[in-house]
């Protein structure tokens, strides 16, 4: 465990807010639209390349979703734009351990702010160990 690194989460991965897409503006296709509660429909365009790790930002906070195909991360989510050399599948398994719902900054509607999430102190193993851990959990 001596090769594990402790840093800000934002030093390991970067989140970005998803994109608005009203149901009336969708064109039927095979691209999943992923919201804080999971796949909420399909569209004919993607905004993010796979693999994808997406977390609930509004409403259903901290839920973690994984996409093996290109996808549209909805405005109610934060999605990982840069894994910074970390294994996406491992990050998918790791994020629930942080209990992200504790970082709610909303008053009437539960909300996560990526700036706060990036400041969480986290400890991650090197890539080789991430691969082994993800293989066992998959």
Task: Kindly give the residue locations of the regions a language model identified.
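Non-catalytic DNA-recognition/assembly elements of restriction-modification systems
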Residues: 1-35, 123-134
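A short beta-sheet element
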Residues: 35-97, 101, 105-108, 112-117
């Amino acid at each position: 465990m001596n090769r594990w690194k402790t840093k800000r989460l934002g030093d390991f991965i970067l989140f970005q807010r998803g994109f608005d897409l009203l149901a009336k503006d969708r064109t039927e296709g095979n691209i999943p639209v992923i919201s804080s509660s999971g796949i909420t429909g399909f569209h004919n365009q993607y905004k993010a390349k796979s693999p994808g790790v997406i977390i609930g930002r509004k409403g259903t906070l901290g839920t973690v979703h994984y996409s093996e195909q290109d996808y549209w991360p909805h405005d109610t989510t934060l999605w990982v734009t840069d894994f910074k050399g970390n294994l996406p599948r491992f990050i998918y398994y790791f994020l629930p351990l942080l209990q992200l719902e504790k970082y709610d900054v909303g008053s009437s509607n539960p909300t996560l702010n990526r700036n706060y999430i990036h400041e969480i102190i986290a400890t991650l193993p090197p890539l080789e160990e991430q691969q082994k851990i993800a293989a066992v959990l998959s």
